[in-house]
Amino acid sequence: MSSSMKAPLRNPPRLLAGEGRVHLSASNAHPCFSTSLAAYPLKLLSPTPLPSQPANFAVLYTLAYGGGLVAGDLVSLSVLIDPGCGLVMLTQGTTKVYKRRPGLRPLSHLHTSQPSSDPNLTRQRMHIRLCSSSFLLLLPDSVSPFRSSIYSQTQRFVLPADRTASVLILDWVNSGRGQRPQEGDEEIWSMDSYGSTNEIWVGDERIMRERMVLDNSHFGLNAGGSLSPIANQLSPYNVYATVLIIGPHLTTLFSYLAYLSDHSRQFQLKEPPGLAWSFSEIDDKLQAGVVRIAACEVEDARKWLREVMTAGGVAALVGEGMWPRCI
């Protein structure tokens, strides 16, 4: 064979429907995505770094074609973050979950690695592995499950055993379409079921596991019917959020939340407040903790999160230009 002949280019690996693979690698300037692959209905976007953006991190948007997921969809994303790199993961608007949507992706979920026994189930899975001194900020918009949808989400974050990596995970859900006077309907917490599980591992040790389950499936809800049992139980709140934090990059935020928690008193009131929150310290040495929030409106929760994260130094991690786009 002539030495001048070039080796044939490798074709990118074939992905299953809804599968994504990301590898964030270090470079001389900003970290770069040495791998960024996605198959319909998943879409990945990486914007050009802003001038004010610190040099040690990159931004990735995860999107669904059509702005939502339907029954039978499976989205499975795996991410690797190299040493010293930071990744900010965002969305562009709420992730809407439909039971069905005529004309949308009739072939999107015919071939998956693990077919679901329930064709009405919508699934999202994420597995993110961080290397030494790396960090992740996962700050999506809230999930919006619509009437009769069945949604299951599992997210696992694996940090190195040397305890030098950090993650901040925002996981939140809203009540759906809400009041729809034109339809003579209130579509509030009217999904069949919603489940979300988050796990954080440090080496081989699981440090945190948070699970939220909302289940209306046994109550036989009908379109145009009365409020669901879940809606009555969760009233007056239309958004619930969980924030998991761990690692040395988030020491200021951990300390600030602990201070706020120690100096805040939420007394028993005749009427529930517009926003209620709590902070639980999981491991002081690892700077690990969990924030739980209930709010009447998504914007109430967003405002509180933005104020606390800004005061806790998260804005400084991403720069003044990028921060307003994060939360």
From Swiss-Prot:
Hydrolase found in the keyword field: no
Glycosylation sites: N120
Lineage: Eukaryota, Fungi, Dikarya, Basidiomycota, Agaricomycotina
Protein name per the record: Urease accessory protein 4
Family (UniProt): Belongs to the UreD family.
Disulfide bonds: none
Membrane topology label: Single-pass membrane protein
HAMAP family from the UniProt entry: UreD
